[in-house]
Amino acid sequence: MTPSVLERYQSAPQNPGVYLMKDKRGTIIYVGKALNLKKRLASYFARETGHDMKTGVLLKKVVDFDLIVTATEHEALILESTLIKKHSPRYNVILKDGKSYPCLRIDTSKPFPALEVVRKIGDDNAVYFGPYSSVQSVRSTIKQVNKIFKLRKCRDVQFANRTRPCLNYQINACLGACCNRVSRQEYARVVGDVILFLKGRAPDLINRLKFEMQTEADLEHFERAAQIRDTILAIQTTLERQVVVSTDRTDRDVIACAINGEKAVVTILFVRSGNLVGSRNYPFDTGLSGVPEILDAFVRHYYERSLFIPGQILIAEKIENHGLVQDLLIEKRGKRVSLVVPERGDKRRLVEMALVNAQKELEKNLSIQNEAWETLTALQTILGMSVYPRRIECFDNSNMAGTDPVSSMVVFVDGLACKSEYRKFIIRDAKENDDYACMTEVLTRRLSSTEAPLPDLLVVDGGKGQLSMAVAVLKSLGLENRFQVAGLAKKDAKLGEVYDKIYLPGRANPVNTRGALKALYLVQRLRDEAHRFAITFQRKRRSKRAGTSVLDAVPGIGKKRKQVLMTTYKGISRMGQATVEELASLPGMTLAAAQQVKSALALDKD
């Protein structure tokens, strides 16, 4: 700690607020909140000994701090969460889960809504379910819902333009809403059943359906009664696959944390109507924090973006801001939420179940981490690197017969793909068929940027030529001694070569990788991933360019109208044969827009 820090904390206000601790480079390394800023800072700086390990390590690096005063501790808690997400401080608990999870959506404002998969929650009147842990779990849920309830599966444009029942209706997998085979009222009732099912209220739904089945049977509507019976059986079959963990039919989430050094895993179990319906594991970098602090950060982060907050949340240990966090949950849910630390009984057994799952997941993660460490250490050795190759970047070019040239950058951190760091590049200046010039441009753009840290190892896809070009770029930017660069060339089977070859600057022969094949395979995975990423991006650009048509230049014809026209007529030729009146009758079209289309098609034909 510096003398200025000791002086400044003594003049800190005795108000609620947030403090941001900084190291000698001005980087924010810790963000915290306090009811009384002066007292909290005094707990750090008024004494030099008696701190826990995390605080001791932190204070050795603090040379400055900033303060933000808030009106209440509640506001400070919210601001703390916002700043942690923004700055990702080294010594805060960071949830390593930035991806958006898939959700299910039903837009009840539509007369015949479908079940959709989305990754963003819109500000609308639709009903959302999730988030789900994977695309596979979403598909499984959709498959169950479609099998039981038979909602429409076609897109809105197809639905609006269909003139006869689809194949799904013909095989009894759809209610046939597109061709008026089901009334709006009946479809709405089915949608209501789907919502109950997805909310975990299947027992309530079954009871109601049994009553309806009996009513239909009493009225001698035996066919309808049989349909309801089949629906009940399908729902019951689904429920049989779920594990009953509680008899009180309460919705609750169960959260526990396993920790080992700077790595942790939080497991959350989802209990709906007494059934264990799913779970999810979240890896954490602990920042040397303990379980209570990790659980505190997790509960705040998770439920801040969760679509559903149950009435009861069981946690393994009491968290630091227990009362404040519970108030935040109540505020978001709009009704009571209990944040409970069970001591005994069925609820404690649920917490222990979550803890066992967290420990197993952590053991798996640590095993993967240890294997990655061994591989990266071997790579460091064979490449003669002075630093551990924690961050590796690999670049690749792609084009189609010299057109639409692009490049990709993929990043592996600690031996694993870090997809949030991937970058795509559209070639701006280099000639389309000049691979060296394209790579020179991309490396120059990447290494001139300060948005991302420099890599420990940079790999280019290619042999000595590409490597020489990369070295030239590094020299031009004054980076030739900042990190290692290597080229990966494919084996030449005609020469009897068995393995791909890694080349280093200033060496005529490739690196000997026979004793470190795992290291070679890691570099190959990088190269293959860069190739995949570049090819995918190049294909998308090519498809987008190929997808342009005469309609793109027609005034008043946007994306939706173009989609309706192309879906209806399947091509420009058939569209040109339609009359203005036929064009104007399509959904979303007007007479003026139809006349514009007709004129444009006539000019295009000429």
Swiss-Prot record:
Q: Does the record bear Iron in its keywords?
A: no
What's an example Gene Ontology biological process for this entry? nucleotide-excision repair
Q: Show the GO cellular component annotation of the record.
A: cytoplasm; excinuclease repair complex
Q: What Gene3D superfamilies does the record tag this protein with?
A: 5' to 3' exonuclease, C-terminal subdomain (1.10.150.20), GIY-YIG endonuclease (3.40.1440.10), UVR domain (4.10.860.10), UvrC, RNAse H endonuclease domain (3.30.420.340)
The UniProt keyword set, sorted, is: Cytoplasm, DNA damage, DNA excision, DNA repair, Excision nuclease, SOS response
Q: Which residues form the GIY-YIG domain?
A: 14-93
Q: What does this protein do?
A: The UvrABC repair system catalyzes the recognition and processing of DNA lesions. UvrC both incises the 5' and 3' sides of the lesion. The N-terminal half is responsible for the 3' incision and the C-terminal half is responsible for the 5' incision.
Can you say what this protein is called?
Answer: UvrABC system protein C
Q: What organism is this sequence from? A: Desulforapulum autotrophicum (strain ATCC 43914 / DSM 3382 / VKM B-1955 / HRM2) (Desulfobacterium autotrophicum)
